[in-house]
Regions:
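Intracellular juxtamembrane helix-capping segments at the cytosolic ends
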Residues: 123-138
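Glycine-rich segments within core transmembrane alpha-helices of 12-TM secondary carriers
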Residues: 141-169
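Short amphipathic helix-loop junctions that connect adjacent transmembrane helices
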Residues: 36-52
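C-terminal ends and interior cores of transmembrane alpha-helices
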Residues: 89-105
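Pair of pore-lining "gating" transmembrane helices in MFS-fold secondary transporters
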Residues: 8-40
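Central cavity-lining transmembrane alpha-helices of secondary-active solute carriers
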Residues: 55-73
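Hydrophobic core of transmembrane alpha-helices in multi-pass small-molecule transporters
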Residues: 26, 106-124
């Protein structure tokens, strides 16, 4: 196995790093995947109308536009590990807060939560994630690293969606 890893520019430590980066990235974006998997049920779970959900979803474009300047600045000024840790904790805490207190959160609180989550995930995490991936192997194997990363995220997204579908089925099936 070690020979195979070395052939593709990895050491056992950097390959393990790639696995952790992939798992962290997918867990970070799991909240958004659930939103996309259950577009009708997600606003209902938050206790908002479809129009209010549109306001929340439009935050993504706003945060990316406003945060574009910060993307490079933050990534070059601070440690990748610190940025990824802060981003993961921020998104995790906000996701937990929304999960525990919805429905019932006011629209301004939900807007602040979505803005903060997008700031942590899109403005802080994404550039640090790409930088960590790029530094995990040599220049000759960058495509492989990104391919493995996206493959891993796809597998994890499938498993999370399968878990989500199973939870919905067992919640709804007894009522049918």
């Amino acid at each position: 196995m070690k020979h195979l890893l070395l052939k593709y520019g990895f050491t056992p430590a950097t390959f393990f790093q790639l696995i952790l980066i992939t798992i962290n990235a997918q867990l970070l974006y799991a909240f958004w995947d659930i939103r996309n998997s259950v577009p009708g049920g997600f606003p209902a779970a938050l206790g908002v109308t479809d129009q209010e959900a549109g306001y929340l979803y439009s935050m993504q474009g706003l945060v990316i536009l406003v945060g574009t300047i910060a993307l490079g600045w933050v990534g070059d000024r601070f440690s990748i590990r610190n940025i990824m840790l802060l981003s993961s904790l921020g998104v995790g805490c906000i996701s937990l807060f929304i999960t525990l207190f919805s429905p019932g959160l006011s629209m301004p609180v939900l807007l602040a939560c979505f803005f903060s989550m997008l700031f942590f995930s899109e403005v802080l995490f994404k550039p640090a994630n790409f930088k960590a991936l790029r530094s995990s192997t040599s220049e000759d194997h960058q495509g492989l690293v990104f391919g493995l990363f996206e493959f891993g995220r796809g597998v994890l997204a499938f498993l999370i969606s399968l878990l989500w579908a199973g939870m919905l089925y067992y919640q709804v099936a007894p009522k049918l």
